[in-house]
Amino acid sequence: MSDGEGEQFFNLEGEDILRLESRLKNPRNDGQIGKNPRQRKEDQAPQEEPKKTTRRPDKNKGLSQLEQLILKYVEEESCQDALKDFGGLIANIRQAHQAELTSHLEKVATEHRANLQALTKSQQEHEKVSKEILSAVIAIRSNLNENHSPRPKPLDPDQVKAARALGFGIGYRTALNVFDRIKGVTPDNAGSQEVKNMAIRAAEEDEYEGSPTFFRKVIDAVKKRMKQGQ
């Protein structure tokens, strides 16, 4: 070091000497002498933040769940082969499941149709029995109403005419038989209105051919008629 350089090195101002002495008396813990305030300000200047690098797009974006799963455990070079094998396996499983499901549905449908047919047949039989029971109840009710009716059931006019005709025929034949046993009786006397009326009354009173009371009434009427004719 030359004399000129030494003079320049020790050519310090008073403030610099005082600051240097203060630093020497109170050294820093790290053993370094404090820097110039200008340098410290420069050191404290905010540093520029490093530029954020743009994130690379996810290479799994747009892939199916199966492809993402395969890429997670299989190398990318073998991904296509693995994807093809797994796809075929899944297709076989799906096809087998579909066939099993179809068979099950067909079995259930067959059982359902059989149960429906049995139910329909049972319902038809039930309706038939119900109709028979209903008819029997209606018949029983009708018989009870007829037998226990407070008002007598009126006779059918045709039945009345038939009964009168039957009674008249029986009574008329009986009168003729009686007249045949009495001498002096002509067919005109046997066919008189009085004898006809008597025969009808006897028939209405249920006195038919062979009844002693009926014969007696007929004979008395004939005798009365004969006396009136004398």
Swiss-Prot record:
GO terms for cellular component: host cell cytoplasm. Its main location: host cell. Residues 21-62 are annotated as: Disordered. The keyword Phosphoprotein applies. InterPro entries: Rhabdo_M1 (IPR005010). It is found in: Host cytoplasm. This is Phosphoprotein. It comes from Infectious hematopoietic necrosis virus (strain Oregon69).
